[in-house]
Amino acid sequence: KKDKLDLSMAAFILKNTLSDNGSVTRGICSVDGEHNVVEIEETYNIRREADGKVMAGEDDRKEVSEDSFVSMNMWGCPPEFFGVLETEFVKFLKKYGDMPKSEFLLPIVIDKLIKNGDADCKPLESHDKWFGVTYAEDKASVCEAIAKLIKDGVYPAKLWD
């Protein structure tokens, strides 16, 4: 299609985004031979087991590759994307608006656009460790990691004066 959206995403490596304190949800991305994202599967309850394997799901547990690309919701989108997002959000509200725990997930919208041929998406690989506080117990290690980045000069001590 001539009016396809050109998108990009920060593609983190799954093993660099796991929490030591519980399971996480990630958009696991499949990439084709031309380095295009062809699928984003929102995957729940991902955790590393005692045997070192990375597993996902509850009753229908499956092993997932710790080297998979995952979305951490850092996207590059043109301004036209926001009109598409608004249309999809209105559809979402009509279907799930009365369900308080429902979530409008960006990776699901982008996956639909890719599969319908309305968008191309390039993964921009990051091999850095993701620092996030999914659980209260994550806070200490995140603070330590950021302090180390500041000490090593990778990250500024102050963003603004």
Functional labels for PLM-detected ranges:
Residues 74-85:
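Conserved nucleotide-sugar donor-binding
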Residues 56-63, 111-126:
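Glycine-rich loop/turn
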Residues 74-75, 103, 132:
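Residues that recognize and position ribonucleotide moieties
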Residues 115, 120, 128-161:
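Hydrophobic helical membrane-anchoring modules
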Residues 1-75:
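Conserved core of the sugar-phosphate nucleotidyltransferase
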Residues 86-119:
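A C-terminal functional module that forms or caps the active site or interfaces directly
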Residues 21, 87-88, 145:
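Residue-level signal for well-ordered alpha-helical positions
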Residues 13, 78, 135:
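Residue-level signal for inorganic ion chemistry
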